[in-house]
C-alpha cells in the first residue's frame, strides 16, 4: 500500500510549514503540496490527486465552506477541517460536517503541543483516507429502512441505547437521532470529535431532534427521551440510568 497523499490548504504560512514538517516525519504520509487559498488548491487537486485534504475554514478570496461545497459536488475528497477553538469556528465546523467534511482538528496553539497536534492529525489523516465518501452518502440517503428498525427498537426496549461513531459519522448520527421518537430510551453517544466541538455539536442536534441532546457531564441521568454525547476526547463519563 502506498503512502497517503495529503494536500494542505491554509492561508497561514506558519500553519502550512508546521503541518508539512511534522507530517513528513510519518513514513506512511506524503505531503504532495500546499496551497494558500482555494484557487491554488483547485489546480493542485487536479494535478496532484491527493487522498486527503486539510482545509482551513477562514481564508481570503474564497472561504473554506464555499470551497468545500464546490469540492464535494465536483471532486469529493476526504477533508479534515482545521478550525479555531472559538464559537464562530465551532459553528462553521458543524456546517462543514453537513457539507461533507469527515474530521476536524483545532489549529495549533496553547491548548496542546505541536507534537500532540501532529500525532492527532496523522491519525485523523489515516482514518480519513479510509472513508468512502460515495458509500457514506448512500448510507445517509438510503438509510430509511434501518432508521425504522431503530425506531422499532426504541419503542420496545427499556434499556439504554449506546451509539459509537467515528470518522465521517456525524451525518449518519444526525440521520439516526432525528428519527428517534420523544419516548425513546435514554441514549449514550461517543462521537470521534475533539474537545470544544462536542458542545456545539450537541446543541445543534438538540435543535433538530425530537429528543433532547446534551453534552454529558459526570453523574448525568440517562432518561427517556434524552441523549448524552460524551465530551470530546473523553469517553469515560459516568452516568446513571433514571427511567
Identify the function of each model-found stretch.
Residues 2-7, 13-20, 24, 28, ...:
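Conserved acid/base catalytic micro-environments in cytosolic active-site loops
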Amino acid at each position: 500500500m502506498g503512502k497517503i497523499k495529503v494536500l494542505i490548504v491554509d492561508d497561514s504560512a506558519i500553519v502550512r510549514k508546521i503541518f508539512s514538517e511534522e507530517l513528513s516525519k510519518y513514513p506512511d504520509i506524503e505531503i504532495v503540496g500546499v496551497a494558500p487559498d482555494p484557487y491554488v488548491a483547485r489546480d493542485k487537486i487536479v494535478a496532484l490527486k491527493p487522498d486527503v485534504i486539510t482545509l482551513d475554514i477562514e481564508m481570503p478570496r474564497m472561504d473554506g465552506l464555499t470551497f468545500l461545497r464546490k469540492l464535494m459536488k465536483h471532486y469529493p475528497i476526504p477533508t479534515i477541517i482545521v478550525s479555531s477553538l472559538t464559537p464562530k469556528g465551532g459553528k462553521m465546523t458543524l456546517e462543514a460536517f453537513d457539507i461533507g467534511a469527515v474530521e476536524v482538528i483545532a489549529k495549533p496553539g496553547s491548548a496542546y503541543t505541536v507534537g500532540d497536534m501532529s500525532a492527532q492529525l496523522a491519525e485523523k489523516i489515516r482514518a480519513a483516507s479510509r472513508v468512502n465518501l460515495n458509500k457514506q452518502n448512500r448510507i445517509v440517503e438510503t438509510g430509511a429502512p434501518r432508521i425504522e428498525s431503530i425506531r422499532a427498537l426504541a419503542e420496545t426496549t427499556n434499556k439504554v441505547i449506546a451509539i459509537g461513531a467515528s470518522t465521517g459519522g456525524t451525518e449518519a448520527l444526525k440521520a439516526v437521532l432525528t428519527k428517534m421518537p420523544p419516548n425513546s430510551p435514554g441514549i449514550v453517544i461517543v462521537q470521534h470529535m475533539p474537545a470544544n466541538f462536542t458542545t456545539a455539536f450537541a446543541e445543534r442536534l438538540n435543535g433538530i431532534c425530537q429528543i433532547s441532546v446534551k453534552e454529558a457531564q459526570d453523574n448525568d441521568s440517562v432518561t427517556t427521551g434524552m441523549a448524552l454525547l460524551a465530551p470530546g476526547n473523553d469517553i469515560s463519563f459516568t452516568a446513571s440510568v433514571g427511567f
